[in-house]
UniProtKB/Swiss-Prot annotation:
Biased composition (Low complexity): 13-23
Source organism per UniProt: Methanospirillum hungatei JF-1 (strain ATCC 27890 / DSM 864 / NBRC 100397 / JF-1)
Location of the region described as Disordered in the Swiss-Prot/TrEMBL record: 1-28
Binding residues annotated for Mg(2+), in chain numbering: 70
Residue positions binding substrate: 42-44, 57, 100, 234
Name by which UniProt lists this protein: 7-carboxy-7-deazaguanine synthase
InterPro entries for this protein: 7-CO-7-deazaguanine_synth-like (IPR024924), Aldolase_TIM (IPR013785), rSAM (IPR007197)
Transmembrane stretches, start-end: none
Length: 234
């Protein structure tokens, strides 16, 4: 299905599929997916922060976090098959691809096939997940970013999945309150992981307070700010 390409004011090229229901029917030879949008921007966080990245946002989520910045992706979405999603992504130039949501692993079989095809095409693929769906059966050359839900989110993650993360994966704690910081510290110290650990303040919170906490507790984690939000990118 053709994508609606437009130029964003910040200068990035965006190929966006609007959220909502679509009438397109998947081809018989390829599994169907619910896609909220496909666009290109700078990766704002994680291991590849700052790199131009193709984002494939899947529709549908099993959580309802209090600070969710993409609530429209919880439902709806355009019906596309895996081959069409790959074709849409490959119209974009960046080497990195981030499959996000929503919760991508609610469409795990299709996501696994999508990742395999993108990797075969020479892309580096990461998947962002809320840590409620097991991912140990995904292709090993995918980089996983697990978002552990802290108390202020109003939701939860399966922290036992932290042991399944590899050294090429990452784990993120989105924090805004003292309770969040204390919870993150407790999980970090009680659930060892091979993954890189990030502490990510909710946009607009007191960043210095969070930095001071990380320093005072000598946490084995990297503080990260959401780069894309500071420079006005999606």
């Amino acid at each position: 299905m053709p994508l609606n390409c437009d130029t964003k004011t910040a200068g990035e090229i965006s190929s966006s599929i609007p959220s909502g229901s679509g009438s397109h029917q998947p081809a018989a030879q390829s599994s169907g997916m619910k896609i909220a949008e496909i666009f290109t921007s700078l990766q704002g966080e994680g291991l590849t922060s700052g790199y131009p990245t193709i984002f494939i946002r899947l529709a549908g989520c099993n959580l309802s976090c209090s600070y969710c910045d993409t609530p429209a992706s919880r439902q709806g979405g355009m019906d596309m098959n895996v081959s069409e999603v790959v074709a849409g992504a490959l119209l974009q130039k960046p080497h990195y691809v981030c499959i996000t949501g929503g919760e991508p692993l609610l469409q795990k079989d299709e996501v696994a096939e999508l990742a395999r095809q993108l990797i075969k095409a020479g892309k580096m693929v990461s998947i962002e997940t809320n840590g409620t769906v097991p991912f140990d059966d995904l292709p090993s050359d995918i980089s996983i970013c697990m978002d552990v839900k802290c108390p202020s989110s109003g939701e939860f993650s399966n922290i036992n999945l932290l042991s399944d993360l590899k050294s090429t994966d990452s784990v993120k704690f989105v924090v805004g309150t003292d309770d969040d910081l204390q919870y993150a510290e407790k999980v970090i110290m009680s659930h060892p992981t091979k993954a890189e650990i990030f502490i990510s303040p909710i946009y607009g919170t007191d960043y210095q307070r969070i930095a001071s906490y990380i320093l005072s507790r000598n946490l084995p984690a990297r503080m990260q700010l959401q780069l894309h939000k500071f420079i006005g990118l999606p």
